[in-house]
A protein has these predicted regions:
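A short, N-terminal "cap"/entry segment at the start of jelly-roll beta-barrel domains
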Residues: 1-40, 50-52, 141-146
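Double-stranded beta-helix
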Residues: 2, 101-146
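Short histidine-centered beta-strand/loop micro-motifs
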Residues: 30-32, 51-57, 74, 83-84, ...
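A short beta-loop-beta micro-motif enriched in histidine and acidic residues
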Residues: 33-36, 47-65, 79
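Tight coil/turn sites that cap or link beta-strands
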Residues: 45-49, 88-89, 95-97, 107
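Short beta-strand His + acidic residue motifs that chelate non-heme Fe in jelly-roll/DSBH
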Residues: 53, 72-73, 94, 99-105, ...
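Short acidic-glycine-tyrosine-enriched beta hairpin
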Residues: 76-96
Length: 146
């Protein structure tokens, strides 16, 4: 997923604010500290869409659903896909080393907190999980999700 628009502002105390408009229509409003800690408010577009599958080597991610619902997909090798539907007011924590992806339903809003040793090289693509998730329709997601 590429970024269409980016705007950045230095807030002080080694913290910067960043706005990104993603190719899938999501709007991301981020606060990032020089130590790698990170907060992001993500607003989905008018259509549901998958993000890009990935894993982190050292970062823990905490996703909280404010509005709507998301599907959390994880991968355990041998092409075993796990799907979980996360609804308003609920959250999920993703630990380092877990291949994962999110499907954001239309109009959903989530908050993401990242912490741990967050470096530019910590994000690693997971094409294996993309192959299992990107073609799933919203209907299939809701049928397979728990």
């Amino acid at each position: 997923m590429n970024r269409n628009k980016t705007m950045e502002l230095l807030l002080g105390d080694d913290v910067r604010a960043l706005y990104e408009q993603m190719d899938n229509g999501e709007s991301k409003y981020k606060m990032i500290a020089d130590d790698g800690s990170y907060y992001c408010r993500t607003a989905a577009s008018r259509e549901g869409a998958w993000q890009n599958s990935h894993l982190h080597l050292h970062v823990t991610e905490h996703y909280l659903v404010q509005t709507g619902w998301i599907a959390y997909a994880s991968y355990e090798g041998q092409s075993i896909l796990h799907l979980r539907i996360v609804t308003e007011g609920h959250h999920i924590v993703v630990h380092p080393g877990v291949h994962h992806n999110l499907y954001m339903s239309a109009g959903s809003v989530i908050h993401t907190i990242k912490y741990g040793m967050n470096t530019a090289s910590d994000w690693t693509a997971s094409p294996e999980l993309d192959r299992l998730t990107q073609s799933l329709s919203e209907y299939e997601i809701l049928q397979k999700g728990s």
